[in-house]
Amino acid sequence: MVEVLLTGIVLGSIFITLLGLLAAAKLQYNRKKTN
């Protein structure tokens, strides 16, 4: 049961990190377009 919980936490962290990177990349792209 603990392993499943740890796996879920790790996957969630990776997912959040990917979302953050995607959002940052989008902001950079939009900024480059406007400048």
From Swiss-Prot:
GO terms for cellular component: chloroplast thylakoid membrane; cytochrome b6f complex. GO terms for molecular function: electron transporter, transferring electrons within cytochrome b6/f complex of photosystem II activity. The gene is petG. One of its GO terms (biological process) is photosynthesis. It is found in: Plastid, Chloroplast thylakoid membrane. Its main location: plastid. The chain crosses the membrane at residues 5-25. SUPFAM superfamilies: PetG subunit of the cytochrome b6f complex. Pfam families: PetG (PF02529). It comes from Cyanidium caldarium (Red alga). Disulfide bonds: none annotated. It is a single-pass membrane protein. This is Cytochrome b6-f complex subunit 5. Keywords: Chloroplast, Electron transport, Membrane, Photosynthesis, Plastid, Thylakoid, Transmembrane, Transmembrane helix, Transport. Belongs to the PetG family. Component of the cytochrome b6-f complex, which mediates electron transfer between photosystem II (PSII) and photosystem I (PSI), cyclic electron flow around PSI, and state transitions. PetG is required for either the stability or assembly of the cytochrome b6-f complex. The 4 large subunits of the cytochrome b6-f complex are cytochrome b6, subunit IV (17 kDa polypeptide, PetD), cytochrome f and the Rieske protein, while the 4 small subunits are PetG, PetL, PetM and PetN. The complex functions as a dimer. Signal peptide: none annotated.
